[in-house]
């Protein structure tokens, strides 16, 4: 190997080790279940995005099998070549009916959706206003676009308005936000963001990755909680890989936006389409989340229980108001030690460190699901509290 490159890479890896930011892969089995196997140890799964427990649902498995038998295992090409199966159009119609939008586009992942949409819509003549805690895919999309990047303090609408007010009137304006923030579990002020976008002539993209299938009418997303709010949002992005238990993502909104993305979005144009099996499972999942209110109600109730008990115990869980509940520790060292102790006690509790979260805010990110029982959560809370006291971390 080229020696200068080897030296450079070894130095960078050593720095990651020293900073407590080196990452390893761990073999995990049964991750679709409430209890998983990680490194051959049985643990309560409090780290998964399988929020409604659909990743192991027999109805989704059967739908995937049926489509595989009918269409094969691969799409064989990009959608613009010969990979656009009728399944795509069926799923996109379902999304439009679900979200109340004109047109939808199914893409390969949430990351490629955000990177592709933002980088194709915005250019160096534009300004993108982004919440400081938005997902990395949003940040990367803005960087790739070459647009002026204005980050406003997390959920600070006054700061955003100052930035909008002082922006060049000659430049087009785009606001982009997560609806549920993936590492903090709090939510965006969508009504107020829409008011600002209308006041200053911007458009807005919302990332519903951690809200699709859960919140709003029929689980359509956080933007559907308030009447008439969703239709004022220009582009909705959501994923199939979390609450819907599948893989892939969608972009939906007015037809002109989606038509433009279909023609200009490089992460859509230059990639092989999703396999038919995934589309079959997605179609079934969209049906289920609209009808199965009990799963969504269980998830929301479990989130409320878990948050309230951790707060009562004295933990810093920030402003979490959803099924995503962080315990903010601070240092990488303490967070890694806490994570190790929790896993030894039988809880899949993963340390989240910079650059995923800001420096000095390393945390354990817990995610409850609709399938957890109160007994599961109580068992976990007792052990979390006991270990934290032993380590003199929080309580």
From Swiss-Prot:
Catalytic activity from the UniProt record? 6-carboxyhexanoyl-[ACP] + L-alanine + H(+) = (8S)-8-amino-7-oxononanoate + holo-[ACP] + CO2
Query: What does the UniProt keyword field contain?
Result: Biotin biosynthesis, Pyridoxal phosphate, Transferase
The entry's substrate-binding residues are: 23, 135, 356
Positions carrying N6-(pyridoxal phosphate)lysine? 242
Q: In which pathway does it act?
A: Cofactor biosynthesis; biotin biosynthesis
InterPro entries tied to this protein: Aminotrans_II_pyridoxalP_BS (IPR001917), Aminotransferase_I/II_large (IPR004839), AON_synthase_class-II (IPR050087), AONS_Archaea/Proteobacteria (IPR004723), PyrdxlP-dep_Trfase (IPR015424), PyrdxlP-dep_Trfase_major (IPR015421), PyrdxlP-dep_Trfase_small (IPR015422)
Per the record, the GO terms for biological process are: biotin biosynthetic process
Its Enzyme Commission number(s) read: 2.3.1.47
The first-level EC class reads transferase
Q: What does this protein do?
A: Catalyzes the decarboxylative condensation of pimeloyl-[acyl-carrier protein] and L-alanine to produce 8-amino-7-oxononanoate (AON), [acyl-carrier protein], and carbon dioxide.
What do we know about how this protein assembles, alone or with others? Answer: Homodimer.
| Stated family | Belongs to the class-II pyridoxal-phosphate-dependent aminotransferase family. BioF subfamily.
This chain belongs to which protein, by name?
Putative 8-amino-7-oxononanoate synthase
């Amino acid at each position: 190997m080229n020696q200068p490159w080897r030296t450079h890479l070894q130095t960078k890896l050593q720095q990651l080790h020293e900073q407590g930011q080196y990452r390893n892969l761990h073999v995990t089995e049964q991750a679709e279940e409430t209890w998983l196997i990680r490194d051959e140890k049985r643990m309560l799964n409090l780290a998964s995005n399988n929020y409604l427990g659909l990743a192991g649902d027999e109805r989704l498995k059967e739908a995937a099998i049926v489509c595989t038998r009918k269409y094969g295992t691969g799409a064989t090409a990009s959608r613009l070549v010969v990979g656009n199966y009728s399944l795509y159009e069926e799923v996109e119609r379902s999304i439009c009916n679900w979200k109340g939008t004109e047109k939808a586009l199914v893409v390969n992942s949430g990351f490629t959706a955000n990177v592709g949409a933002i980088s194709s819509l915005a250019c160096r003549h534009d300004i993108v206003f982004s919440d400081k805690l938005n997902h990395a895919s949003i940040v990367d999309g803005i960087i790739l676009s070459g647009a002026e990047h204005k980050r406003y303090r997390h959920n600070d609408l006054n700061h955003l308005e100052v930035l909008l007010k002082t922006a060049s009137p000659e430049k087009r304006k785009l606001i982009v936000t997560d609806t549920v923030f993936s590492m903090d579990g709090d939510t965006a002020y969508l009504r107020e963001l829409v008011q600002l976008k209308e006041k200053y002539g911007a458009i807005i993209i919302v990332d519903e990755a951690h809200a699709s299938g859960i919140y709003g009418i029929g689980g359509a997303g956080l933007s559907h909680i308030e009447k008439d709010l969703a239709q004022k949002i220009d582009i909705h992005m959501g994923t199939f890989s979390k609450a819907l238990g599948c893989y892939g993502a969608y972009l939906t909104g007015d037809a002109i936006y989606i038509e433009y993305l279909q023609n200009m979005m490089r992460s859509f144009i230059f990639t092989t389409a999703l396999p038919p099996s995934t589309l079959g499972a997605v179609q079934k999942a969209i049906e289920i989340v609209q009808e199965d209110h009990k799963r969504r109600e269980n998830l929301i109730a479990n989130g409320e229980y878990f948050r309230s008990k951790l707060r009562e115990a004295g933990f810093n869980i920030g402003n979490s108001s959803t099924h995503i509940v962080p315990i903010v520790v601070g240092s990488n060292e303490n967070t890694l030690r806490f994570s190790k102790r929790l896993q030894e006690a039988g809880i899949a509790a993963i340390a989240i460190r910079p650059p995923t979260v800001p420096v000095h805010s390393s945390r354990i990110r817990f995610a409850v699901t609709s399938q957890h029982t109160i007994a599961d959560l109580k068992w976990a809370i007792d052990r979390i509290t006991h270990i934290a006291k032993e380590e003199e971390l929080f309580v």
